[in-house]
């Protein structure tokens, strides 16, 4: 198989025009003939480039409002023709070989994301000719290059210059992989969209059936191969969504340290998503996907020091997340006090990074600033299937709360209750969080019995010499019995925030009244399994 193929003729037809003029200019300057369609051809002609309209080349006009432009044997024969094997039949029918195809597809995802998108709008943004050319060129990658991403334009020009106007087989093969990935993702988007519609009962109006299509097609891009997975005998890789806009562990930039492990990524995600809940300077320390210390303060240094106090033992080898820039003072406090696997923050100051450079094993990530969280889906793998649900973006404010006890919470208790409620959302069920003065005092996670989570939170606080009396307690789900309230009262909890909804709510409320505990219902549960 000949490794290089000279590029003499290009077909360009793009919806995303970014960089296309410059790329076409570079091709033309290297003696490559340009074929193009519709708006792309007009854009190139207006830029003064010598371009031949596909309709002039085929002798067949664009028709049906642009639905039929490139679906012609002279186009697909030029792409699919096997060099050295189909040359005779191509010459017989006046088919010129096309050596590189540059195509990206109608913006279907952006169209259906619009609130006012109709089914007709969606249908008209289903590209037919584009995917057909992409697949044709990718199939014939032995002879033809296919470019579907504008980010590849510079590398293409560089390789042409380095190879006397030719592209190598490895390049064409890698471009073909991208092309098939591109069309697979495109068809998946269309199938997922149509799968959320139910057929009309009257007239021609489709009705949405919710977020979940009949067949779920997922497309993720491999970001990283890993040494191993959750355990050393498991192979693993990290895949990310394409074009993620939200600040996340998937989009974070690593500034130093070893490659992130499977467990690093899972724990960093838990820490970052928790710290996003707070508008004040906040710090979250996570171990094994559970917060072991959370606090807010006047600065991130104060927040870190208070979060660390909750459970210094568990913080060893943990993940630390901030919602403000990591400064030198905080970086110094961390590395002088504890071993840490990962630190993630929106940004890191140059002074902080210089200090951390002395600890090259510490992985330092920046994720950028974040806005409101975007809606999306969560997945949980089960044997033979996939559980799919909306992300848990539920939150409450003081206005949403119901006080069900005889005693009203004080202003301080209310603040503490809202604080530990935010934390409880990120603790594995059964989850109990004790907090006071915007700092976790004790956290009980992952117990099969809720009362034991409450007891563990109290034990944690006692082990660190933290005063529980006067603290608030959050529970991620309702109390099925009064025993959890009795356990909380025994260590001095004075306010409890929980969803409510148990058939024994009256019994639980009576226990709170018996202990003069203020009890708040959120009417929202935050199970986390």
From Swiss-Prot:
The keyword Hydrolase applies. InterPro entries: AICAR_Tfase_dup_dom_sf, Cytidine_deaminase-like, MGS-like_dom, MGS-like_dom_sf, PurH-like. SUPFAM superfamilies: Cytidine deaminase-like, Methylglyoxal synthase-like. Belongs to the PurH family. Signal peptide: none annotated. This is Bifunctional purine biosynthesis protein PurH. PANTHER family: BIFUNCTIONAL PURINE BIOSYNTHESIS PROTEIN ATIC, BIFUNCTIONAL PURINE BIOSYNTHESIS PROTEIN PURH. HAMAP family: PurH. The keyword Hydrolase applies. GO terms for molecular function: IMP cyclohydrolase activity; phosphoribosylaminoimidazolecarboxamide formyltransferase activity. It catalyses: (6R)-10-formyltetrahydrofolate + 5-amino-1-(5-phospho-beta-D-ribosyl)imidazole-4-carboxamide = 5-formamido-1-(5-phospho-D-ribosyl)imidazole-4-carboxamide + (6S)-5,6,7,8-tetrahydrofolate; IMP + H2O = 5-formamido-1-(5-phospho-D-ribosyl)imidazole-4-carboxamide. The IMP cyclohydrolase activity resides in the N-terminal region. Pathway: Purine metabolism; IMP biosynthesis via de novo pathway; 5-formamido-1-(5-phospho-D-ribosyl)imidazole-4-carboxamide from 5-amino-1-(5-phospho-D-ribosyl)imidazole-4-carboxamide (10-formyl THF route): step 1/1; Purine metabolism; IMP biosynthesis via de novo pathway; IMP from 5-formamido-1-(5-phospho-D-ribosyl)imidazole-4-carboxamide: step 1/1. NCBIfam families: PRK00881.1, purH. One of its GO terms (cellular component) is cytosol. Its EC number is 2.1.2.3, 3.5.4.10. GO terms for biological process: 'de novo' IMP biosynthetic process. Residues 1-148 form the MGS-like domain. Keywords: Hydrolase, Multifunctional enzyme, Purine biosynthesis, Transferase. It comes from the Bacteria. The gene is purH.
């Amino acid at each position: 198989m000949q490794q290089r193929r000279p590029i003499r003729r290009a077909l360009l037809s793009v919806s995303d025009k970014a960089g296309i003029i410059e790329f076409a200019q570079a091709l033309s300057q290297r003696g490559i003939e340009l074929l193009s369609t519709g708006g792309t051809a007009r854009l190139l002609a207006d830029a003064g480039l010598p371009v031949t309209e596909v309709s002039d080349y085929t002798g067949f006009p664009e028709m049906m409002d642009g639905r039929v432009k490139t679906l012609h044997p002279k186009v697909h024969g030029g792409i699919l023709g096997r060099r050295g094997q189909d040359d005779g039949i191509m010459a017989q029918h006046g088919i010129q070989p096309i050596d590189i195809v540059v195509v990206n597809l109608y913006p279907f995802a952006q169209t259906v994301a619009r609130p006012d998108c109709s089914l007709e709008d969606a249908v008209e943004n289903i590209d037919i000719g584009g995917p057909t050319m992409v697949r044709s060129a990718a199939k014939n990658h032995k002879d033809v290059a296919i470019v579907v991403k504008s980010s590849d334009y510079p590398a293409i020009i560089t390789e042409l210059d380095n190879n006397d106007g030719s592209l190598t087989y490895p390049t064409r093969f890698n471009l073909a992989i991208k092309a098939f990935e591109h069309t697979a993702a495109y068809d998946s988007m269309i199938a997922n969209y149509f799968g959320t519609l139910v057929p009309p009962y009257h007239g021609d109006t489709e009705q949405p059936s919710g977020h979940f299509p009949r067949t779920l097609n997922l497309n993720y891009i491999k970001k990283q191969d890993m040494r191993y997975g959750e355990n050393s005998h498991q192979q693993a890789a990290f895949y990310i969504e394409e074009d993620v806009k939200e600040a996340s562990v998937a989009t974070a930039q690593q500034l130093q340290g070893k490659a992130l492990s499977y467990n690093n990524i899972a724990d960093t995600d838990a820490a970052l998503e928790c710290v996003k809940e707070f508008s004040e300077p906040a710090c979250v320390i996570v171990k094994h996907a559970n917060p072991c210390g959370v606090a807010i303060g006047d600065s991130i240094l104060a927040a870190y020091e208070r979060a660390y106090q909750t459970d210094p033992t568990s913080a060893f080898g943990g993940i630390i997340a901030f919602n403000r820039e990591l400064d030198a003072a905080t970086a110094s406090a961390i590395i002088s006090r504890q071993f840490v696997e990962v630190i993630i923050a929106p940004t890191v100051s140059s002074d902080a990074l210089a200090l951390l450079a002395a600890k090259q094993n510490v992985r330092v990530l920046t994720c950028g600033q974040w806005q409101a969280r975007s809606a999306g889906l969560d997945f949980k793998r089960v044997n033979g299937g996939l559980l799919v649900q909306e992300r848990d973006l539920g939150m409450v404010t003081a206005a949403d709360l119901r006080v069900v006890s005889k005693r009203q919470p004080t202003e301080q208790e209310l603040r503490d209750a809202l604080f530990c409620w935010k934390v409880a959302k990120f603790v594995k069920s059964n989850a109990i969080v004790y907090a006071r003065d915007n700092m976790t005092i004790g956290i009980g996670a992952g117990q099969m019995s809720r009362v034991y989570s409450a007891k563990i939170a109290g034990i944690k606080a006692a082990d660190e010499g933290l005063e529980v009396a006067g603290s608030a307690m959050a529970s991620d789900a309702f109390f099925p019995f009064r025993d959890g309230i009795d356990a909380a009262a025994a260590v001095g909890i004075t306010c409890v925030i929980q969803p409510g909804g148990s058939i024994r709510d009256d019994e639980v409320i009576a226990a709170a009244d018996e202990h003069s505990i203020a009890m708040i219902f959120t009417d929202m549960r935050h199970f986390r399994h």
